[in-house]
Curated annotation (Swiss-Prot):
The lineage of its organism: Bacteria, Thermotogati, Thermotogota, Thermotogae, Thermotogales. GO terms for molecular function: aldehyde-lyase activity; transaldolase activity. The gene is tal. This is Probable transaldolase. SUPFAM superfamilies: Aldolase. The active site is at residue 83. CDD domains: Transaldolase_FSA.
Length: 218
């Protein structure tokens, strides 16, 4: 399973890359605006850091506008993936962009039916929103599992990005289902490292080592 960071913060991305466990990044205009950064410049900076897929979202909602924006964003870097909303115009844009060799990520997906349309249009990635679905019905993981099963049934090449991930168990459950990718906030990535028994084990090892060194001095 690949791990993407859902952020536009360069320091968070640098840490993830240094740890050697981050395969890509997903962004959106909201995340970039929170950083106070110029949109295209920040996308380029992220691409230079990650050297892997970086999803950048269009803001137009009409077909022509989405295609125009997508073509401009695709010029920033070979790593740019265009995030397109799940709408009729969005799916039409995905079909056009896919034919041009531009990678796409269909976002704001909340049902298996929507995920089928994304795959049929030739999307590179599809992003079901697990946490937001849980907010509505507690069915986020079930939705994700159904999408995995459908994609496996038909051999769709579209990769599934589990999005709106709220906690480590979401990551584990997605992995058990065979999801291709999870995109997670940096805070969730940090929590993946944590377990109380690990902390206790390190504490005991250090205490034993300290005693060993003290005994050597006697």
């Amino acid at each position: 399973m690949k791990i993407f960071l859902d952020t536009a913060n360069l320091e968070e991305i640098k840490k993830g890359v240094e740890w050697g466990i981050v395969d890509g990044v997903t962004t959106n205009p909201t995340l970039i605006s929170k950083e106070g950064a110029e949109f295209k410049q920040r996308v380029k900076e992220i691409c230079d850091l990650v050297k892997g897929p970086v999803s950048a979202e269009v803001v137009s909602l009409d077909y022509e506008g989405m295609v125009r924006e997508a073509r401009e964003l695709a010029q920033i870097s070979e790593y740019v993936v265009i995030k397109i909303p799940m709408t009729p115009d969005g799916i039409k844009a995905v079909k056009t962009l896919s034919a041009e060799g531009i990678k796409t990520n269909v976002t704001l997906v909340f049902s298996p039916a929507q995920a089928i349309l994304a795959a049929k249009a030739g999307a590179t990635y599809v992003s079901p929103f697990v946490g937001r679905m849980d907010d509505l019905s507690n069915d986020g993981m079930r939705m994700l599992g159904e999408i995995v099963e459908i994609y496996n049934n038909y051999g769709f090449e579209t990769e599934i990005i589990a999005a709106s991930i709220r906690h480590p168990m979401h990551v584990v459950e997605a992995a058990l289902m065979g999801v291709d990718i999870v995109t997670i906030p940096f805070a969730v990535l940090e929590r993946l490292f944590k377990h109380p028994m690990t902390d206790l084990g390190i504490e005991r090892f250090m205490e034993d080592w300290k005693k060993y060194l003290e005994n050597l001095k006697k």
